[in-house]
Design a protein with these regions (language model features):
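Extended, charged helical/alpha-beta scaffold domains that provide interaction surfaces
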Residues: 1-181
Length: 181
């Protein structure tokens, strides 16, 4: 569907911004999981420094996502996601002010098409590899159809996540230059 929208020249800006938002939210969930089982310290396994390192240099600066200990106690993953997404929006808005809406919409289409095509081709290769390997599972007394179905769903979800993550990273790191530059 997204590929068809791109090829038809449709505006994919809302979808690209949603991909950026979802990619950020996914990373925040990984680095800042809330442990509801540990009611006294649900943040004990947070890796805020790891999250900062992941985005440092292309979305964050040294002064971003710095919290005092008392602030960390009240900090919620949603707030961190909102902060990161606001930075992403700022990058996109500044680019649009500098280069114009038409160029930015074309950039979004090109980046999205490249990522969808690349990830889809990788997915097809991985599915062929899964199909070859699934036959061996029948020897392990596992139903190959069930195994194939479960793994193929997981692989498809991983492909979608990779499209989101790569599109977000490319949209936020690509550098455009004017003819004067």
């Amino acid at each position: 569907k997204q590929r068809d929208q791109v090829l038809n020249g449709e505006n994919v800006h809302p979808q690209v911004m949603e991909m950026i938002k979802q990619a950020i939210e996914n990373q925040v969930k990984i680095y800042l999981p809330m442990d509801d089982a540990d009611l006294d310290n649900p943040r004990h396994n947070w890796n805020l420094d790891g999250l900062r390192d992941r985005y440092m240099g292309w979305l964050l600066t040294e002064n971003d996502l710095i919290y005092r200990d008392e602030e960390k106690k009240e900090l919620k993953p949603e707030k961190v996601s909102e902060t990161l997404y606001a930075k992403a929006e700022q990058i996109c808005n500044l680019r649009e002010q500098k280069f114009g809406e038409d160029i930015c919409r074309e950039l979004e289409r090109v980046i999205l098409l490249k990522n969808v095509d690349t990830q889809w081709m990788d997915h097809i290769d991985a599915m062929e590899e899964l199909q070859r390997g699934i036959r061996l599972r029948a020897y392990g007394q596992k139903d190959p159809v069930v195994e194939y179905r479960m793994e193929s769903y997981d692989m498809f979800d991983a492909m979608i996540d990779a499209i989101r993550e790569n599109t977000a990273r490319m949209m936020l790191t690509v550098r455009l230059h004017t003819q004067e530059e």
